[in-house]
Regions:
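An aromatic- and glycine-enriched ligand-binding surface/loop that stacks and positions planar moieties
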Residues: 38, 70-71, 76, 92-99, ...
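Outer-membrane beta-barrel translocator domains and adjoining extracellular loop/strand segments
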Residues: 42-45
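Conserved, well-structured interaction surfaces
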Residues: 1-35, 49-90
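Short coil/turn and helix-start
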Residues: 7-11, 40, 141
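A sequence-level detector of short, solvent-exposed, charge-rich linear segments
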Residues: 47-51, 121-122
Length: 183
């Protein structure tokens, strides 16, 4: 819907659309950690009496999150970091955060919680296990390779872009950390 905003230049629209993709991926990841595969919402919906969306597999959910982050990171208008002069944009997602979140998602997905020869939970009902909504269905070593490659890509980009860090507290007090958190 950002395309319909009047008096906003195309660069800002593309930046905000990329940020929105990172936000969606981060919210999906929060849910994924608790529930595994999720219904994938890829379009806007009108008011309807029912939304019958099937639950996706773990693999489909991870792919959806990673694809969103790849699309966001490939957007030239999404900056690597915000810098100190960009105070109007503080607290926003950046290319670095998109690439870092991708690493975190792939690491979590490759972990034994989802990637093992035996499902994490063996208690009935087993519908989610059988449908691969809470695990991959078998151990897949290539998931570790995907995670490793995402980390290599992140650190390669980090070297080319220079230094990157999270906001640091200016003083080691509760108020100093609170101020850094609120930036």
């Amino acid at each position: 819907n950002v395309d319909r905003v009047p008096d906003m230049d195309d660069a800002e629209k593309k930046r905000l659309a990329a940020e929105a993709k990172v936000i969606v991926a981060s919210r999906y990841f929060d849910l994924f950690r608790h529930f595994g595969g999720l219904p994938l919402i890829k379009e806007t919906y009108d008011v309807q009496p029912s939304y019958e969306l099937p639950r996706a597999t773990v693999e489909e959910t991870v792919k959806y999150m990673v694809d969103l982050l790849d699309e966001a990171a490939a957007t030239p208008q999404l900056p690597w970091d915000l810098g100190t002069d960009d105070t109007n944009w503080q607290g926003r997602f950046t290319k670095a955060s998109a690439m870092g979140l991708k690493c975190k998602i792939l690491l979590f997905a490759a972990s034994p919680l989802f990637n093992d020869n035996v499902p994490y939970c063996m208690e009935p009902p087993q519908d989610a296990v059988v449908n691969h909504q809470v695990w991959y269905g078998a151990y897949k070593p290539e998931l570790w390779d995907q995670c490793w490659q995402a980390c290599v890509d992140f650190f390669t980009e980090l070297q080319s872009k220079g230094y990157y860090e999270l906001t640091q507290a200016t003083e080691a007090t509760a108020q100093g950390y609170r101020n850094a958190y609120n930036k």
